[in-house]
Regions:
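Catalytic domains of carbohydrate-active enzymes, especially glycoside hydrolases
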Residues: 3-14
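Extended active-site neighborhood of metal-dependent phosphoesterases/phosphodiesterases
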Residues: 5, 20-141, 154-178, 184-203
């Protein structure tokens, strides 16, 4: 809230895991109040929120996270992955929100803990990302996912290697400006040799 007062955000990009632990069971789950409504209650945060699913949401009812769009005025999640274009004083920005858990074998293969991950069509999403980025003509193109492609972390290397093999070639092909993610609970800004993409962890 205090930061909101200082910078006056236009909207919030929520890179997953609003609900930690086991996600939520429904749109009426009390965790919506304890994890979201009561925490982010400052007047400056009563603006549009554009979220994506994190791995913890995948432990619960992922459809309920999308359906909360019909409950909360500020929660705006039209699909598991989606895109919007913004124009501010002649500068255009395209943000592409993606669903990274289904792109990682660790989650796809653990059908007991993450039952919805294996049900998602990975090839369809990757083709959609490629198509959106092919058509993007904005001044800035930013992709938002929950999991990092590159990061210094003790978390499972396979998470990043799967994204390096499946997602990163598409981002590099289209020369996106930035990939923003969460998941590892710290801040990192990474540049890789041979790529002009800024890989930012902000969680």
């Amino acid at each position: 809230g205090k930061m909101g007062e200082e910078i006056g955000p236009e909207f919030v990009v929520a890179a997953g895991d609003i609900h930690h632990f086991e996600g939520v069971r429904s749109v009426n789950d009390p965790l919506w109040m304890t994890n979201y409504e009561l925490i982010y209650s400052h007047p400056e945060l009563m603006i549009d929120w554009y979220p994506i699913l994190g791995n913890h949401e995948y432990r619960g009812n992922t459809q309920a996270v999308l359906d909360y769009t019909n409950v909360s005025r500020r929660w705006s999640m039209p699909a598991r992955y989606y895109t919007k274009s913004f124009n501010e004083e002649g500068v255009t920005v395209r943000i592409v929100w993606i669903d990274t858990a289904p792109l990682i074998d660790k989650y796809r293969n653990d059908t007991q803990t993450y039952p919805d991950a294996c049900k998602q069509d990975m090839k369809k999403q990757l083709a959609w990302i490629d198509d959106v980025l092919t058509k993007a003509k904005e001044d800035w193109v930013i992709v938002v996912g929950h999991h990092p492609i590159y990061a210094e972390t003790s978390k499972d290397d396979s998470e990043r290697s799967d994204l390096q093999n499946r997602l990163d070639p598409i981002l590099r092909k289209h020369k996106v400006d930035m990939y923003v993610c969460g998941h590892i609970h710290n801040f990192q800004h990474i540049r890789m040799n041979g790529s002009n993409i800024d890989y930012v962890v902000n969680s």
